[in-house]
């Protein structure tokens, strides 16, 4: 079956790392092992958000390609449960475990999923955090890399599986293709941790959704001009 006949879902996650000072001493030593300068130590401490062993998923955004309906599941610091809509997008708060359960429940409705850099970040992160939370993964988010019938990772596709000298951010790809970057509204992925500390949970959720809207537009270019 050709992929344009398949129901597609685009998804993206946002994560926040643990407080470095709360790690046990062995874990601290592990992260600081190769950090020699103060700058390198700060960088190592800030890297906790990149690893499923030391971070939580605080937001998962999902966007149906065909209908433009969106679902954003997000943590709100354990506050009162929230549910609201903005246009075609439903925002639902919950714990990390509830976020992941909602993700897997929604994912079963689609045959193909689209990410940007999902193979090296979002997909393994979701699978491992699900296991850590005692949630059985119901689908392999890491299928064979060199086929895109099930998973289209646009970072892989647009660099022709790392044939280019380097990878580029979603922001730079958006600029190249004339797509509105999710960063244009004053927030970047590097600010997620600070926004979370400031209890700006809904701002993070909206930022995540801007990411997947941009990913959808980029996917349309790839599908029309580069897909074989």
What are these regions (language model features)?
Residues 2-7, 55-58, 63-68, 73-87, ...:
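Metal-dependent phosphoesterase core characteristic of DEDDh/y 3'-5' exonuclease domains
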Residues 2-98, 105:
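Conserved RNase H-like, two-metal-ion catalytic cores of nucleic-acid enzymes
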Residues 26-27, 99, 192, 203:
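A general marker of short, structured functional hotspots
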